[in-house]
Amino acid sequence: MQWALGRRWVWAALLLAAAAVLTQVVWLWLGTQSFVFQHEEIAQLARQYAGLDHELAFSRLIVELRRLHPGHVLPDEELQWVFVNAGGWMGAMCLLHASLSEYVLLFGTALGSRGHSGRYWAEISDTIISGTFHQWREGTTKSEVFYPGETVVHGPGEATAVEWGPNTWMVEYGRGVIPSTLAFALADTIFSTQDFLTLFYTLRAYARGLRLEFTTYLFGQDS
């Protein structure tokens, strides 16, 4: 009995050590990456269009991002609004850029929604174009409310409760281990809604982003 208990402790210690090593390797890898976008750059661009009709704001933002970062934003024919079910909430996203370490997307909800933010190996910032974003941070007893032009930052490993009012739309930038965010983003789709067409759309959008980055890396911005 004691021998079996000892083995369990050994395995637990080994798993914790492996997790610690993996975490260190991941952050060392991120430290070697050269990033296309910056958090403040995306936030400043989004703030320019805060308060406008969200569709007009998004169209202008896309034009500006393509001007500043040619070869890194998906073309119009590959942009698609896709439902996202995660953490008990429902929204929609339109992916503009994706790689192994970054993404830029448009996100929001026409009806309003609330749920769990998820925990990620990534830092995520959302700059609000319209509507309201309520955030209740873990370990606190009060929530915060963010309005158009303000930026909400979600740090690596953090968890919050989130709530968006009707017609809340924002620009989101994520930096970190982006494939690790897919498990949370797709869990409700796989195990709850079982909307496998949406699952396909989501994976296709990410694959398109990776393909664009690979093509730009190999052949340059004009490919």
Swiss-Prot record:
Q: Topological domain, Cytoplasmic: which ranges?
A: 31-223
Q: Which UniProt keywords are present, listed alphabetically?
A: Cell junction, Cell membrane, Cell projection, Cytoplasmic vesicle, Endoplasmic reticulum, Lipid droplet, Lipid transport, Membrane, Nucleus, Postsynaptic cell membrane, Receptor, Synapse, Transmembrane, Transmembrane helix, Transport
**Miscellaneous remark of the record:** Sigma receptors are classified into two subtypes (Sigma-1 and Sigma-2) based on their different pharmacological profile.
User: Main role?
Assistant: Functions in lipid transport from the endoplasmic reticulum and is involved in a wide array of cellular functions probably through regulation of the biogenesis of lipid microdomains at the plasma membrane. Involved in the regulation of different receptors it plays a role in BDNF signaling and EGF signaling. Also regulates ion channels like the potassium channel and could modulate neurotransmitter release. Plays a role in calcium signaling through modulation together with ANK2 of the ITP3R-dependent calcium efflux at the endoplasmic reticulum.
The organism that produces this protein has a lineage beginning with: Eukaryota, Metazoa, Chordata, Craniata, Vertebrata
Q: Which InterPro entries match?
A: ERG2_sigma1_rcpt-like
What family is it from? Answer: Belongs to the ERG2 family.
Which locations, inside or outside the cell, does it occupy?
A: Nucleus inner membrane; Nucleus outer membrane; Nucleus envelope; Cytoplasmic vesicle
Which residues does the UniProt site feature Important for ligand binding point to?
126, 172
One Gene Ontology BP term is:
regulation of neuron apoptotic process
What residues form the membrane-spanning segments?
10-30
Describe the protein's quaternary organization and the partners it interacts with.
Homotrimer. Forms a ternary complex with ANK2 and ITPR3. The complex is disrupted by agonists. Interacts with KCNA4. Interacts with KCNA2; cocaine consumption leads to increased interaction. Interacts with RNF112 in an oxidative stress-regulated manner.
Name the principal localization, coarsely classed. nucleus
Q: Which residues lie on this side of the membrane: Lumenal?
A: 1-9
- Domain comment (free text): The C-terminal helices form a flat, hydrophobic surface that is probably tightly associated with the cytosolic surface of the endoplasmic reticulum membrane.
Chain residue ranges for the region called Important for ligand-binding: 99-106
Q: What is this protein called?
A: Sigma non-opioid intracellular receptor 1
Gene Ontology annotations for the cellular component aspect, listed alphabetically: anchoring junction; cytoplasmic vesicle; endoplasmic reticulum membrane; growth cone; lipid droplet; membrane; nuclear inner membrane; nuclear outer membrane
Q: Where is this region: C-terminal hydrophobic region?
A: 177-223
Endoplasmic reticulum as UniProt keyword: yes
Q: From what organism does this protein derive?
A: Mustela erminea (Ermine)
What segment(s) does the record annotate as region Targeting to endoplasmic reticulum-associated lipid droplets? 2-8
Topology versus the membrane: Single-pass membrane protein
